[in-house]
UniProtKB/Swiss-Prot annotation:
Glycosylated residue positions: 153, 224
Name of the protein this chain belongs to: Protein yellow
UniProt subcellular location: Secreted
Function: Controls the pigmentation pattern of the adult cuticle and larval mouth parts.
Pfam families: MRJP
Signal peptide (UniProt feature, chain positions): 1-30
Length: 560
């Protein structure tokens, strides 16, 4: 695989730069606002010393080419990054960057909270595989351990699904909760989480999207209990939206159900609205957290879920987040872009904008987050290339971008400070009604989101872009591509025969989670033994180093 060099902008004259900027940016498109903070050809981990790193590589405990970052979250001076154990050789799945020590560049990932807590297969004490994570306003880090090692047909399940919550002040785990068997099924794959804080930190709920088991799981912090909503067709994929095109690779993820989720600010009734989308879909759905917080509604809530309009073509999304003033950001994986929508506006393509797009740096923007200071963080990882072809490890493959939210949405349809869009309109979930006919419902199910919006909003204005140079040193083409109208063809060139030819159905990172009552393979280079070492084993490598300490070297590294 290679990346085509777009060239610097120094050779462009002022006139040609202006022409490029004007012709390449659509009316809803922002212009190179995300700033690259960190980047890697391949991931590296902060081993205690060089000798242990060499031993880990020699033994297969660390295989750099097998590590792919998928989740990002920011808190204080730490930027958390998750690395699932899809392949052997992943020494830690929950890691962070000390941003005081590494302002930019390609920093080593530090296991969080320490090496021992990242021991695969040590179910009660460690995290085997983490995907997307969430920091709440109470300073807690929520991590769902899927308990899996491997990908597709290679998946094993050393541990059950478990919610892990860490106090980020003390860096200690303060809660571990195993999902009961009733909350999962043989196809369960949970890779996303949303956290809902109510009137105080104890009034907290987490929601988990079961992408391949087609369900939505609620967990109550106060009750330390969970329950599952699984009887809704909105959790399922759209059979017409299972075809994907990313980085020049055509593939089918037609089985991908509910995935991306976001929560609105608390509404006047004291609850939030959860928005969600199946991955194989271009449509968004909504439900009040009043329903999700009520265990008695798991079988009687069909009409409380609401369908919104489609986003438009090439609009698959895996990650979404909403600010406390109602701006939703979401990745657009087919378009190498990050989109936006203001939740006070109708959910229609007219009111969707693109805050940034990059056919090199944003190939598969896997995760999007907004931190407590309203800074946006975006992680891109070229995931389909990693899964279906070969990454070129002489090229930059993984990037983390950041920008203030206000900067990203400025002069887009999501910026309500622009009076041309008219005053905001309140959009709310329909109230629960009692027995009897339900207004607006037909015999076939719930209606589309058809609230009347007043005042009538004018057509989105055209946005003019000046000749100021972009923040990055290349200008990716955003025009029509050879793939047809609206088709995005990335400038990343890949081979397509190392795993399978492009265009065929390929296994994604899903599992068949049947932990209860079954035996699973728990050996291999990806698992560290949990027994204390004998005296003769001291100095025997990373495994021994981890097991010889109650806590890892993280504290020394952090204080250093």
């Amino acid at each position: 695989m290679h990346v085509q060099d777009k060239g610097g902008i120094g050779a462009l004259t002022a006139l040609s730069l202006l022409l490029v900027a004007v012709t390449m940016v659509t009316p809803t498109q922002a212009a190179y606002k995300l700033q690259e903070r960190y980047s890697w050809n391949q991931l590296d981990f902060a081993f205690p010393n060089a000798r242990l790193k060499e031993q880990a590589m020699a033994s297969g405990d660390y295989i750099p080419q097998n590590a792919l970052p998928v989740g990002v979250e920011h808190f204080g001076n730490r930027l958390f990054v998750t690395v699932p154990r899809w392949r052997d050789g992943i020494p830690a799945t929950l890691t962070y960057i000390n941003m005081d020590h590494s302002v930019t560049g390609s920093p080593e990932l530090i296991p969080y909270p320490d090496w021992r807590a990242n021991t695969a297969g040590d179910c009660a004490n460690s995290i085997t595989t983490a995907y997307r994570i969430k920091v709440d306003e109470c300073g807690r880090l929520w991590v769902l351990d899927t308990g899996t090692v491997g990908i597709g047909n290679t998946t094993t399940n050393p541990c059950p699904y478990a919610v892990n919550v860490f106090d980020l002040t003390t860096n200690t785990r303060i809660r571990r909760y195993e999902l009961p068997a009733a909350d999962t099924n043989p196809n369960t794959f949970i890779a996303n989480i949303a956290v809902d804080i109510g009137k105080n930190c104890d009034d907290a709920y987490a929601y988990f999207a079961d992408e391949l088991g087609y369900g939505l799981i609620s967990y109550s912090w106060e009750l330390n209990k969970s329950w599952r909503f699984s009887a809704h067709s909105y959790f399922f994929p759209d059979p017409l939206r299972g075809d994907f095109n990313v980085a020049g690779i055509n593939f089918q993820w037609g089985e991908e159900g509910i995935f991306g989720m976001s929560l609105t600010p608390i509404r006047s009734d004291g609850y939030r609205t959860l928005y969600f989308s199946p991955l194989a879909s271009h449509r968004q759905f909504a439900v009040s957290t009043r329903i999700l917080r009520d265990e008695t509604r798991i079988e009687d809530s069909y009409h409380d879920f609401v369908a919104l309009d489609e986003r438009g073509p090439n609009a698959h999304t895996t990650s979404r987040v909403m600010s406390d003033d109602g701006v939703e950001l979401f990745n657009l994986i087919d378009q190498n872009a990050v989109g936006c929508w203001h939740s006070s506006m109708p959910y229609s393509p007219q009111f969707h904008g693109i805050v940034d797009r990059d056919d090199v740096g944003l190939v598969f923007p896997a995760d999007v987050k907004i931190d407590e200071n309203k800074n946006v963080w975006v992680l891109s990882d070229r995931m389909p290339v990693f899964l279906l072809s070969d990454l070129d490890y002489s090229d930059i493959n993984f990037r983390i971008y950041t920008a203030p939210l206000a900067t990203l949405i400025e002069n887009t349809v999501c910026d309500l400070r622009n009076n041309a869009y008219g005053p905001p309109n309140t959009v709310s979930i329909p109230k629960q009604v009692g027995p009897g006919p339900r207004p607006g419902l037909s015999a076939v199910g719930p209606p589309l989101y058809t609230n009347q919006y007043r005042p009538v909003l004018p057509q989105k204005p055209q946005t003019s872009w000046g000749p100021s140079p972009p923040s990055r040193s290349y200008l990716p083409s955003l025009g029509a591509s050879p793939g047809g109208p609206g088709q995005v063809v990335s400038s990343v060139s890949v081979s397509t025969n190392s795993v399978g030819p492009a265009g065929i159905e390929v296994p994604k990172a899903y599992v068949f989670n049947q932990h209860n009552g079954l035996n699973y393979e728990t050996s291999g280079p990806h698992l560290f033994p949990t027994l204390q070492p004998t005296q003769s084993q001291v100095g025997g490598g990373l495994k021994t180093y981890v097991n010889a300490r109650q806590s890892g070297w993280w504290h020394h590294q952090h204080q250093g």
